[in-house]
Amino acid sequence: MEEKLKKTKIIFVVGGPGSGKGTQCEKIVQKYGYTHLSTGDLLRAEVSSGSARGKMLSEIMEKGQLVPLETVLDMLRDAMVAKVDTSKGFLIDGYPREVQQGEEFERRIAQPTLLLYVDAGPETMTKRLLKRGETSGRVDDNEETIKKRLETYYKATEPVIAFYEKRGIVRKVNAEGSVDNVFSQVCTHLDALK
């Protein structure tokens, strides 16, 4: 299993809130048959499963604390091991959020093939999030909160991008255009992996 994970394509997908990375991940799954793993979704699924690990996570999250890195990695690893035989590769969405997370992932799972950086400017992301807020009812889609989320995102992500740029595996896509325009850039990078 270890060997299989080391040979499979693993793509970290990084982009700010409202950059459109979720949409791009869906399109990649449809076209390339990759498995889309979002740490947020994995955590939520574990909590609602009512497992022992889920109960522990629920308590941590209710206190507003960060879930331990080890737990997140165990969940990612379990999800990858479960799918490694049938998947063409993995999209790890919104991870790593800091350099240490990336290093731990490599130590415990495998090295990423590349980091796809879905890059939209702060004005674009804000506009998209406010638009989404009109229909989503998500409490975190208001201007004040969006500003804070973007600040947090930039502070956390810049060192991660720099870390992987040194290795030459960052592929940046300009996410200002239409969904299809952005996806054609994504395809160029993914097609080059074959």
Swiss-Prot record:
Monomer. This is Adenylate kinase isoenzyme 1. PANTHER family: NUCLEOTIDE KINASE. The modification N-acetylmethionine is found at residue 1. Its main location: cytoplasm. Residues 131-141 are annotated as: LID. InterPro entries: Adenylat/UMP-CMP_kin, Adenylat_kinase_CS, AK1, AK1/5, P-loop_NTPase. Catalyzes the reversible transfer of the terminal phosphate group between ATP and AMP. Also displays broad nucleoside diphosphate kinase activity. Plays an important role in cellular energy homeostasis and in adenine nucleotide metabolism. Also catalyzes at a very low rate the synthesis of thiamine triphosphate (ThTP) from thiamine diphosphate (ThDP) and ADP. The modification Phosphoserine is found at residue 38. Its cofactor is Mg(2+).
